[in-house]
């Protein structure tokens, strides 16, 4: 590097950290510092590193790029002659296809980043990588860096982008404590990609935070390590990081989409869910997919015939069970042209449509004249009461259908104006949506379970479950098993 556009600015920022260089600033705190000093987030990250590691600006950027030297070489190996035991020659296949036109996506930078991400994974299976949270997130990091190096960005900007990747990666490296692509290739990769692309496209530090939240959200609770022992599956995980990061960046930069969640909250939640969910989800992954794991022929020669026979039987059993599970779903599905449900206002057929239909069933049983209401919702639904309580109340008090926008908007005010007692309570049991209605003559109750598409499962009711199911069918509400 010969010309340094940002050197003076970043050197002046070192003073922000010099009194307490090892202070553990969170990512959101660094974003706030960057905004306060009119600096890029990568500038603040570089200044902090200079204060902590006692490097000059030039040496820091050299060290940052040097940290990816091996991984970039691995990328080249995967792109040219590498062959993975799980991904085959996917990278060189794409390199060939790219000669005739962009193989994966029309955006040249993103297409290159995705191709090089896969190339890095292929090379990883040949010679290994320097890991961050794991070798998984090193793939999108390396793929993105190589794509940026080939794009007409100055070397200094690429080095600063790489520093930002390392900073974000360092947090995920600590947060990843068990199996999980959500804290590695998919999640960490998406967050870092979003941050880098947002900054390079002229985004503010605040926009970087929003882009990261948007990119990270779909990745949470995706522990995939056992799953990727199945050939091919990892390909969409690690390239998905690039796609999600790009999408998060564009949404943050080009729209007024509200994103109220702090990025520290999002990463902390991702790490916590990662620890809690991975053991449960991984055991299910393994049950279904272990028969499809890649094997080593030489190792298999060491396994006894009875064990191999048992595993073949397990594979056949998994196929049978899976087909029966899908067959059960098919039996419950509607005719092709009746697949879609009734219009649901409020934003979610599960969070609003299903509870609203519960209210409609209760209204049908009560016959109108409601003088008291009690609603119990599982924690997930209770936390979304802003959107589902209006639906439940309009269904229960008016018998309104799920598409009645006017009733949805006026019912809570009507309840408050008329002074109808309404009790709302959370319950710990999953899926629960339960309602009691009281009239001058009787009390009715519908105890149901939340289902998507506006459906509901009725488990109990007053005067009877049978009458509730009959009422639902009369109203055209789909009762799920």
Task: Report residues per predicted region.
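Alpha-helical support elements that line or immediately flank enzyme active sites
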Residues: 97-103, 138-155, 195-202, 394-401
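A short glycine/serine-rich beta->alpha loop
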Residues: 100-103, 123-135, 175-184, 229-235, ...
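Glycine- and small hydrophobic-enriched segments that form the cores of compact globular domains
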Residues: 126-139, 144-162, 168-171, 176
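Acidic-glycine-rich active-site phosphate/pyrophosphate-binding loop
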Residues: 106-123, 155-174, 218-224, 362-372
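Structural helix-adjacent loops and short alpha-helical linkers that scaffold large soluble proteins
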Residues: 152-160, 202-209, 254-263
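A structural-propensity feature for long, helix-poor, extended segments
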Residues: 163-205, 210-211, 217-248
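Active-site cofactor/substrate anionic-group-binding motifs, chiefly glycine-
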Residues: 74-139, 152
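Catalytic-core signal marking the mid-to-C-terminal active-site face
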Residues: 1-71, 257-481
């Amino acid at each position: 590097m010969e010309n340094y556009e940002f050197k003076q600015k970043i050197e002046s920022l070192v003073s922000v950290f010099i009194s307490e260089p090892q202070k553990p600033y969170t990512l959101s705190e660094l974003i706030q510092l960057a905004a306060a000093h009119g600096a890029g987030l990568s500038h603040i990250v570089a200044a902090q590193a200079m204060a902590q590691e006692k490097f000059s600006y030039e040496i820091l950027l050299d060290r940052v790029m040097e940290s990816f030297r091996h991984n970039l070489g691995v990328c080249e190996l995967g792109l040219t002659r590498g062959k993975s035991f799980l991904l085959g020659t996917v990278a060189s296949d794409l390199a060939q296809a790219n000669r005739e036109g962009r193989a994966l996506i029309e955006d040249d930078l993103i297409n290159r980043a995705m191709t090089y991400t896969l190339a890095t994974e292929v090379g990883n299976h040949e010679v290994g990588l320097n890991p961050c949270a794991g070798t998984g997130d090193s793939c999108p990091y390396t793929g993105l860096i190589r794509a940026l190096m080939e794009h007409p960005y100055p070397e200094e900007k690429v080095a600063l982008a790489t520093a930002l990747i390392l900073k974000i990666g360092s947090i995920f490296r600590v947060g990843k404590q068990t199996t999980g692509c959500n804290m590695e290739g998919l999640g960490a990769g998406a967050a870092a990609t979003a941050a880098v692309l947002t900054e390079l496209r002229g985004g503010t530090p605040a926009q970087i935070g929003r882009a990261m939240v948007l990119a990270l959200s779909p990745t949470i609770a995706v522990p995939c390590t056992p799953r990727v022992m199945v050939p091919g599956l990892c390909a969409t995980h690690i390239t998905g990081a690039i796609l999600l990061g790009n999408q998060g960046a564009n949404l943050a930069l080009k729209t007024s989409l509200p994103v109220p969640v702090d990025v520290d909250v999002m990463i902390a939640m991702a790490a916590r869910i990662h620890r809690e969910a991975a053991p449960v989800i991984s055991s299910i992954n393994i049950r279904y997919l272990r028969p499809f794991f890649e094997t080593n022929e030489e190792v298999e020669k060491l396994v006894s015939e009875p064990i191999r026979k048992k595993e073949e039987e397990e594979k056949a059993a998994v196929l049978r069970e899976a087909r029966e599970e899908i067959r059960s779903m098919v039996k419950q599905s509607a005719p092709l042209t009746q697949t879609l449900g009734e219009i649901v206002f409020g934003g979610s057929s599960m969070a609003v449509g299903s509870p609203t239909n519960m209210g409609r069933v209760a209204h049908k049983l009560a016959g109108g004249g409601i003088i008291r209401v009690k609603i119990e919702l599982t924690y997930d639904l209770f936390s979304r009461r802003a959107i589902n309580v209006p639906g439940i109340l309009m269904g229960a008090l008016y018998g309104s259908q799920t598409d009645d926008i006017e009733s949805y908007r006026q019912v809570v005010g009507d309840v408050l104006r008329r002074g109808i007692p309404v009790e709302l309570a959370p319950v710990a049991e999953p899926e629960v949506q339960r309602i009691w209605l009281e009239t001058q003559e009787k009390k009715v109750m519908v105890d149901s379970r939340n289902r998507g598409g506006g459906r509901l499962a009725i488990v109990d009711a007053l005067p009877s479950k049978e009458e509730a199911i009959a009422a639902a069918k009369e109203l055209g509400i789909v009762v799920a098993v």
